[in-house]
Every structure is written in C-alpha cells, then in structure tokens.
C-alpha cells in the first residue's frame, strides 16, 4: 500500500520549498523575520518547527519581508535564495545566502544581492538546471515602478 500525503502538511505556509537530501526532506520557509528549515524522514511529518538558519541584522537593505526562500545544493555547497527588502516593497530584491557548515539546515551567511543591473523589484527566484548549465529564474517588474510584472531568466 502506498502512503498518502496529509493535507495540509502545515498551516499558514506561504511559498513553501522542499528538497530531499540524504534520505530526509528539508522544508524551508520564512518565519519571524528570518528563514527557517525543518526536516523529517517522511514528507508528511514536516512541520513549521524548524531552526532559524538566517536572521538579518536590522537596518539592512534585506532586513524585512523575507519571502519565498529556497535552498539548493550547487558546486559542493548549500545556497539559499530569498527575496527581501528594507521595509519598502519597491526595494524587494533577490539575495543569496550560503551555508556555513555545508548542511542544508546549517547557519547561513549573506553572500550578496543578485543584481541584473536594472535595480528593479525581484521576487520568487529559483535555480533551473538546463542543458548542463544553471539559470536563475525570477519574477520582477520591468521598471522601478509597478507597471508590469514579468518572468526573467539569466545564466548563472
């Protein structure tokens, strides 16, 4: 008999991301002004009771509104991609963090903002492997004003 998923797996979980590593599922989510990860050996045991892996210092361009974090294992390390701003939505940008101990549930430190040169609003980024290369895909505005939202892709 095949197990079924219990729905909802968790309540109040906007922008969920789950990855499997070493026979465990890791669920990454925004929580209390930071990014948290919980893990379980079975996906239907995941809960929002995880460890905070990154909490930004106050007063930074990435201190507020951390949205849609994702963790990816790339080039021998764990990276977290998350949208954040300084409290003004127009300043939402994508940031990359790196695990300090090489584990998906380790502490993460800021690497920097992902910058395509436009300075435009950017959220909901993900990594896309395609044709032996990596691409970054995100949703963003076409200008500094919210006139039109598009999906963008760029080689990493």
Residue ranges and their predicted role:
Residues 1-156:
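Carbohydrate-active catalytic/glycan-binding domains of CAZyme proteins
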């Amino acid at each position: 008999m095949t197990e079924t998923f219990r729905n909802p797996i968790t309540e109040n979980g906007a922008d969920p991301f789950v990855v499997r590593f070493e026979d465990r599922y890791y669920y990454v989510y925004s929580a209390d002004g930071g990014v948290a990860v919980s893990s379980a050996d079975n996906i239907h045991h995941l809960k929002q009771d995880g460890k905070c892996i990154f909490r930004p210092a106050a007063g930074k361009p990435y201190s507020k509104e951390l949205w849609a974090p994702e963790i990816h294992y790339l080039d021998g390390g764990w990276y977290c991609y998350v949208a954040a701003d300084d409290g003004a939505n127009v300043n939402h940008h994508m940031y990359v963090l790196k695990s300090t101990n090489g584990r998906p549930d380790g502490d993460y430190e800021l690497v920097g903002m992902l910058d395509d040169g436009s300075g435009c609003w950017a959220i909901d980024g993900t990594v896309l492997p395609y044709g032996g290369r990596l691409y970054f895909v995100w949703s963003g505005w076409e200008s500094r004003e919210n006139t039109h939202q598009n999906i963008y892709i760029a080689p990493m």
